[in-house]
């Protein structure tokens, strides 16, 4: 008898899992992907929209391509996850039972957690707001631009620093190169998960573009012209660009899968939750590696999605020994002018997490373009 495998979320993890499952399972097994959106767009695209090299409407790929592969797509919202009954409740399609569940719902942004941000600040991680940020920058004649990381952890750790360089370039080209750009972070270093050495390299890179890094500055409240931080510091600003606090979606927290925390704890190798037939992958999860947590990045979600799929295939009796998540990943750090650095990491290294940052090059930038291109091709066509 065929199994129904339900995947909540059509991001990196969900799409990777759905494709791996469909590739290896016969048609008697149903694979269902549910997402509120009917399209997929990588988060990295927001930087290209900010830069002006890409438009939002040209960056959204319809999920309809999954149907041609034999993957069912539900454009719906999950409102309850009942792990005891192995079922979910949805807004439009009612109750849906499952044999296996993969939770890949990502992280929820909570901009109103910082009083005054909504209405005064602009959300860098909301693709609908990014074109407006670009327009604001193009209209500036100078002034103070504040980029505030409002909570930890957050998706794609290098992104605020990449954005600061892009913003510096935009202002310089617009004749407002005398503007002051500050990045504020609650953390003691730029990218805590990557350690002090690599963080220092990141700070040095942005400083070459006139951007100042302000560690240990957790945003407390915002007014029309001022930022107040937990450490008592008050700063003036003209344009505030924020990376809001993140947490798992309410429906996940209400399910009990987070065990009272903000994130779903999972087995670091298998992606299994505390429920035998429920897996969780990507930004919705938390994996502790010593004193740090695995960063929230698309490459980790993708690899975890493949592992969850192979774990399920193994239980069904298909394939070799179930796969194990390696803790290895990489990302690109853009520095403008079609140049990008290449950051690789091994969080499960037996001697402790290890990192390497290759210097910026046009070749790495082309690799980033290809990163998007190949995944969209493989997942949605």
Regions found by a protein language model. Name each.
Residues 1-4, 71-162, 169-173, 241:
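FAD-binding core/adjacent interface of flavoenzyme oxidoreductases
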Residues 2-71, 153-193:
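Beta1-alpha1 glycine-rich phosphate/pyrophosphate-binding loop at the start
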Residues 30, 69-81, 96, 171-263, ...:
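A Rossmann-like FAD-binding core segment of flavoenzymes
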Residues 117-141, 234-239, 243-303, 310:
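FAD-site-proximal beta/loop scaffold in flavoenzymes
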Residues 169, 300-326:
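Internal hydrophobic alpha-helix adjacent to the cofactor/substrate pocket in enzyme cavities
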Residues 263-280, 335-348, 352-353:
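FAD-binding beta-loop-beta segment adjacent to the flavin cofactor pocket
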Residues 155-171, 297-304, 332-343:
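Short, electropositive alpha-helical surface patch
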Residues 341-381:
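C-terminal auxiliary extensions adjacent to catalytic cores
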């Amino acid at each position: 008898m065929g199994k129904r495998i339900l995947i909540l979320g059509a991001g990196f993890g969900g799409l990777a899992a759905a494709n791996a499952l469909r590739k290896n399972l016969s048609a008697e097994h149903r694979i269902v992907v549910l997402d509120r959106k009917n399209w997929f767009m990588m988060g990295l695209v927001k930087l290209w929209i900010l830069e002006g090299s890409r438009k939002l409407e040209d960056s959204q790929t319809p999920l309809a391509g999954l149907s041609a592969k034999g993957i069912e797509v539900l454009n719906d919202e999950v409102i309850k996850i009942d792990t005891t009954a192995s079922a979910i409740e949805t807004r439009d399609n009612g109750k849906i039972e499952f044999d296996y569940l993969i939770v890949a719902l990502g992280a929820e942004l909570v901009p109103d957690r910082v009083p005054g941000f909504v209405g005064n600040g602009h959300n860098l991680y909301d693709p609908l707001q990014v074109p407006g940020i670009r327009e604001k920058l193009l209209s500036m004649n100078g002034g103070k631009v504040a980029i505030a990381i409002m909570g930890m952890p957050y998706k794609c750790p290098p992104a605020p620093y990449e954005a600061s360089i892009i913003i510096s370039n935009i202002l310089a080209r617009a004749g407002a190169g005398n503007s002051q750009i500050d990045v504020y972070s609650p953390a003691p270093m730029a990218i805590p998960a990557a350690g002090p050495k690599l963080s220092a390299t990141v700070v040095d890179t942005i400083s070459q573009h006139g951007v100042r890094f302000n560690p240990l500055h957790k945003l407390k409240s915002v007014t029309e012209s001022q930022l107040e931080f937990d450490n008592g510091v008050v700063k003036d600003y003209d344009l505030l660009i924020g990376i809001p606090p993140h947490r798992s979606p309410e429906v996940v927290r209400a399910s009990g899968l987070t065990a009272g925390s903000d994130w779903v704890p999972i087995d670091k190798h298998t992606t299994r939750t505390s429920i035998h037939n429920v897996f969780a992958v990507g930004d919705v999860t938390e994996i502790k590696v010593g004193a740090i947590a695995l960063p929230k990045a698309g490459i980790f979600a993708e690899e975890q999605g493949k592992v969850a799929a192979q774990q399920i295939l193994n239980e069904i009796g298909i394939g070799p020994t179930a796969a194990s998540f390696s803790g290895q990943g990489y990302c690109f750090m853009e520095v403008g002018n079609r140049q990008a650095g290449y950051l690789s990491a091994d969080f499960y290294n037996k001697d402790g997490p290890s990192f390497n940052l290759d210097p910026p090059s046009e070749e790495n930038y082309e690799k980033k373009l290809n990163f998007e291109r190949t995944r969209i091709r493989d997942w949605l066509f």
